[in-house]
């Protein structure tokens, strides 16, 4: 049983993808199960549409997901050039909304046979994406936190007040879409260890 999830706002396009996949699965006598979008992390293959805020640091999760799941990007052809500056997304298979049925079917055969991406996306590829929206001071703060410094120590090292440092930390957390300090520290530990080598 192949579990598939599609996160796409255009319901007509999503329905079209499901028809193509169902037809192919029937030809191969392969059973597929379409999961709801909120269960995308449990799917074997996930189709992810680029939303309006895809420029954010959200793509840092791609290397982690591709260790156990094939991810494919749904986007417009005009996004292709922008994707070149997001190597973690550019490495994934793409389905363009402008593709005709024949082209989507051709791409889908590779995706469903899991030949579209041979290896997981390496975690090092995301360094630029993850930190591109941070100021120099924010990067410095992240590096100090990743090194294990407490807030009061980082404030002193950055020549800032504790209140300014807290404000800076909140700004970083917003950019990373994390809400609690525990999530923030876990995020740094899991995704930003590369800061220590800089």
Swiss-Prot record:
One of the GO BP terms on file: regulation of DNA-templated transcription
One Pfam family hit: GerE
InterPro entries reported in the protein's UniProt record: Sig_transdc_resp-reg_C-effctor, Tscrpt_reg_LuxR_C, WH-like_DNA-bd_sf
Alphabetical keyword list: DNA-binding, Fimbrium, Transcription, Transcription regulation
Residue ranges occupied by any HTH luxR-type domain in the UniProt entry: 127-192
Chief place of localization: other
GO CC entries: pilus
One MF annotation (Gene Ontology) recorded for this entry: DNA binding
Subcellular location(s) per record: Fimbrium
Name under which the protein is recorded: Fimbriae W protein
Organism: Salmonella typhimurium (strain LT2 / SGSC1412 / ATCC 700720)
Lineage: Bacteria, Pseudomonadati, Pseudomonadota, Gammaproteobacteria, Enterobacterales
